Amino acid sequence: MGRMHAPGKGLSSSALPYRRSVPTWLKLSSEDVKEQIYKLAKKGLRPSQIGVILRDSHGXAQVRFVTGNQILRVLKAKGLAPDLPEDIYHLIKKAVAMRKHLERNRKDTDSKFRLILVESRIHRLGRYYKTKGVLPPNWKYESATASALVA
């Protein structure tokens, strides 16, 4: 799929392993992986960060193959899932950083334009997540209160 606000086509992607079974050399059981996920989530890490740590430190390349569920579903079952979906969280974080930059550099017109693009992406994602029921129907992105969402 192509990029929304850029000319790139987005053709590059990483290939998942064809075999969906757990590697024979992996000594972690499903329960061990789940405990690691819970421990890392309680530290305040996002699901993608948890996946990177499990891949790099513990050797579990795909949590889904070991546990049978994705990291976010494991967290939801335990009640540890983040309030905001990760993609919208990072967009809000980016918008807050851009606003902070624009307070110091008022004449940076390119950043003003890019902020408009980022905020339009936030609104579009918010609309999508409201229809899917991930966000409450009365959720609304406001730039004034955005820094509290990502703090």
Curated annotation (Swiss-Prot):
Pfam families, sorted: Ribosomal_S13_N, Ribosomal_S15
Gene3D superfamilies (alphabetical): 4.10.860.130, S15/NS1, RNA-binding
InterPro entries in the record: Ribosomal_uS15, Ribosomal_uS15_arc_euk, Ribosomal_uS15_N, uS15_NS1_RNA-bd_sf
Keyword annotations: Ribonucleoprotein, Ribosomal protein
UniProt keyword Transcription regulation, yes or no: no
PROSITE patterns tied to this protein: RIBOSOMAL_S15
GO function terms (MF aspect): small ribosomal subunit rRNA binding; structural constituent of ribosome
GO cellular component terms attached to this protein's record: cytosolic small ribosomal subunit; nucleolus
Any one Gene Ontology BP term: translation
Family statement: Belongs to the universal ribosomal protein uS15 family.
Protein name (Swiss-Prot/TrEMBL): Small ribosomal subunit protein uS15
Protein source organism: Ciona intestinalis
